[in-house]
């Protein structure tokens, strides 16, 4: 992300996302009420009931920020607070897409915190990885990035029975097709890593073909009990895969969640969850790592949103680690039952000491 602070009070910043990961970073950083100046286009009347698409620069006070993973676009909407007078757009609603490479200027009345600016400036695309799970019944392929996982394919093998004379030939075709799809998606998403999972030797045959077709790709195999989407999710829980993909925050999040569950089974005093409780321990300087879903940052509940904002500022200012993940990611869905946010503590904090 390109970041330029344009005023001494750190109210105005100029930004340019340089990857899809940057777009997601914008999604979790922009807030309703921020004013965005951006070059966009809008239909305007030109007489005789006709309209024409005109390029213009608008200042928009945001009330909606939407990100759809793997589309390369972030959609922002709000009320126009400044625009060309001749088109009468002030006070009207406008929506536009922020794409990779788009420059935008963001104004925030209360200013930007040091932690927010640092997060934007240091945020780099962690890259992507493709993950496949294959057996004699199913083949699934997914792409994994810091902002989420997308299933690209989930198909049945439909192989003939073991006694069918054509089975060996059909298995070979199945392996060829699986390898081809992995190579195609690795190239399309510029993924340096491919993980191929499944039971038995079939995954090894696929991996060998992938490696021959794309020598620059780092290919790893991992044993799982099945193929298909269930096999992909099983692979993500393997420690060997976590090591390979440790740069991706969604996998890092799985590790934090597993550590949280391990700790809570032994001692409730070593972890915290829910926005209010996490804020209480953050004020004590007790938080080592906090994991939360992105939707909390834009919660319609003012108390929840303010508690989360303060907790994150405190944790980051005291050298703690903050991991923000999509609510619809595997780890994000599991976080819902804990109020959307959990924390690993540096030292035990008794329950009675956590009251705000």
Curated annotation (Swiss-Prot):
Pfam families, per the entry: eRF1_1, eRF1_3
GO molecular function: endonuclease activity; metal ion binding
PANTHER family reported for this sequence: PELOTA, PROTEIN PELOTA HOMOLOG
Cofactor(s) the protein needs: a divalent metal cation
Subunit-structure text: Monomer.
Keywords assigned: Cytoplasm, Endonuclease, Hydrolase, Metal-binding, Nuclease
Family affiliation: Belongs to the eukaryotic release factor 1 family. Pelota subfamily.
Gene3D superfamilies, sorted: 3.30.1330.30, eRF1 domain 2, Pelota, domain A
Protein's UniProt name: Protein pelota homolog
């Amino acid at each position: 992300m390109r970041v330029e602070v344009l005023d001494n009070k750190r109210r105005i910043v100029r930004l340019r996302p340089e990857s899809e990961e940057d777009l997601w970073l914008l999604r979790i950083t922009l807030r309703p009420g921020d004013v965005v100046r951006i070059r966009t286009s809008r239909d305007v009347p030109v007489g005789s009931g006709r309209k024409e698409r005109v390029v213009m620069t608008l200042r928009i006070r945001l009330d909606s920020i939407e990100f759809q993973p793997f589309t390369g676009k972030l959609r922002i909407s709000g009320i126009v607070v400044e625009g060309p007078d001749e088109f009468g757009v002030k006070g009207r609603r406008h929506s536009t897409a922020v794409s990779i490479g788009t420059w935008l200027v963001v104004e925030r009345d209360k200013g930007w915190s040091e932690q927010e600016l640092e997060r934007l400036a240091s945020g780099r695309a962690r890259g992507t990885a493709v993950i496949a799970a294959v057996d004699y019944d199913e083949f699934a392929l997914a792409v994994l990035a810091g902002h989420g996982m997308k299933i690209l394919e989930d198909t049945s093998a439909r192989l003939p029975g073991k006694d069918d004379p054509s089975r060996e030939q059909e298995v070979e075709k199945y392996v060829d097709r699986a390898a081809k799809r992995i190579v195609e998606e690795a190239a399309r998403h510029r993924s340096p890593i491919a993980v191929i999972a499944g039971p038995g030797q079939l995954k090894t045959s696929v991996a060998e073909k992938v490696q021959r077709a794309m020598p620059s790709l780092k290919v790893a195999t991992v044993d799982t009990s099945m193929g298909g989407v269930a096999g992909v999710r099983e692979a993500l829980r393997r420690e060997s895969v976590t090591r390979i993909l440790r740069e991706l925050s969604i996998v890092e999040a799985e590790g934090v969640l597993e550590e949280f569950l391990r700790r809570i089974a032994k001692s409730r005093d070593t972890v915290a969850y829910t926005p209010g409780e996490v804020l209480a321990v953050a004020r004590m300087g007790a938080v080592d790592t906090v994991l939360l879903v992105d939707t909390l940052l834009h919660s319609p509940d003012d108390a929840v949103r303010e508690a989360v904002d303060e907790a994150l500022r405190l944790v980051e200012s005291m050298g703690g680690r903050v991991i923000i993940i999509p609510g619809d990611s595997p780890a994000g869905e599991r976080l819902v039952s804990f109020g959307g946010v959990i924390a690993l503590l540096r030292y035990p904090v008794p329950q009675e000491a956590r009251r705000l």
